[in-house]
Amino acid sequence: MPKGKLEHVNISVTAPERSAALLQDLLGWKERWRGDSQKYGWTTHVGDDHDYLALYTGDHVTGQYSKGAPLNHVAFTVDDLDGAEAIVAEAGLKPFGHDDYDPGKRFYFFDWDGIEFEVVSYAGGAQ
C-alpha cells in the first residue's frame, strides 16, 4: 500500500504578500516560489523544505469566507505559543478559543479573509 504525506495546500487569499509575511513571522517559514498561476491569477508559496501553503489570488478572489468555507481551519504547531500569539495580535488579528488540554495548548484566529487558523504547542516537544 502506498504511503503518503501532505505536500501543500492551496488557498485563495486577497493579499498573498500580506498572508505570506504573517506565516513567515509566525512559523519561521520562507518564501519558496512566487509567480503567475497556471491559468490566471498569481501565487506565492511559503513553507519549509518539505511542505508549504500556496497562497493564490486573482480578480475573482474576494475573501470574507464563512466559517467552514472553503475549509474548517488550518492548524500549525509552534514551539512558542505565547510568541506566536503576540505575532498574531501585532498583525491586528484577534486570537480566541484558547485551550489548555492534554497534550498541549492552542488558540485560533481568523485572518483578514475570514480563514480560520489554529496554533498549537505540545508539551515535551511531541509535534
Name every feature range the model reports, one short phrase each.
Residues 25-26, 87-91:
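Short amphipathic alpha-helices in soluble, non-transmembrane regions
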Residues 2, 89-127:
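Vicinal oxygen chelate
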Residues 1-20, 71-76, 123-127:
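N-terminal beta-strand motif that seeds the catalytic metal site of vicinal oxygen chelate
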Residues 67, 74-88:
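Mid-chain, well-packed structural core segment of small domains
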Residues 40, 70, 103:
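Exposed loop/turn and edge beta-strand positions of beta-sandwich/beta-sheet ligand-binding modules
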Residues 54-56, 118:
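Conserved beta-strand in the GNAT
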Residues 49-53, 60-62, 81-83:
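Short, charged/polar surface micro-motifs in flexible loops or helix N-caps
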Residues 10-53:
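Core segments of cupin and vicinal oxygen chelate
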